Amino acid sequence: IGMRAFISNPVYLNKLVKQCSDFQSKWRMITYFHGEHTGVCHGIALSMCYGNQGYIDFDDITSGAHDYWTLGSPYENSKMKDMILYYQMTQCLDSGRSTYGISKNSGWGNGDLETFLKKFVAEAQYAKRVKKPFVFSFMIPEGGHSVVVCGYKKNTDGNHEITIYDENSYHPGSYGGYLTMKVSSDFKSFHFADSNSRFDDVCVEDLWTNLN
């Protein structure tokens, strides 16, 4: 899914401007507001999590809506479009930085992947216990993508299975769906493909769990 990077709601605009605390944040925001179409997977995933935790008034966006699924289409609802773009653009802000991260350029032999996967599994276990999903971002050959982590179980082999909702992909004919990321019991490897079974060669990137 893609949208033109333009927010008409002054409330969201003011929030973004007030949180641009330094030159780099402002520059990142300016480059986003060039008006061209942009992917909004992060905005959708993040707003899904905030909505689940009660931070979003669904009825204010779409009259009568009581959850994310009853909001309708952002292409037909400017309030929903602005909400998604707002959360998409919070990536430009210092306050919108990820909770945990691993650099795709750091290599896999220095222990960073193992540390990240341990934190990832711990967060998934906690999220299941308190029923609060969070956002997971990763890199694929075509670019970055964000999804919602919403479940966890440990299988009989001692490996970890993390349930993920992939809300969409930017490929033609793509669709949303649930999938499983498998993490080995020693946290040294993982197996993952998106909801369209496109990618096994994934570089893990970031977790967003501090949703407040």
Regions found by a protein language model. Name each.
Residues A5, A45, A65, A122-A127, ...:
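A sequence-composition feature that detects small, non-aromatic residues
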Residues F6, F23, F33, F58, ...:
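Phenylalanine-focused residue identity feature
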Residues I1-T115:
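Cysteine-nucleophile protease catalytic domains, especially the papain-like/related folds used
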Residues S106-Y165:
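Active-site-adjacent substructure of cysteine-protease-like catalytic cores
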Residues P141-G143, K153-N212:
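Cys-His-centered catalytic/binding microenvironment captured across papain-like cysteine peptidases
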Residues K15-K18, K26, K79-K81, K104, ...:
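Context-gated lysine
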Residues G43-L46, Y50-I56, C150-Y152, D166, ...:
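Generic ordered-secondary-structure signal
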Residues H34-H37, H42, H66, H145, ...:
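Histidine (H) residue identity feature
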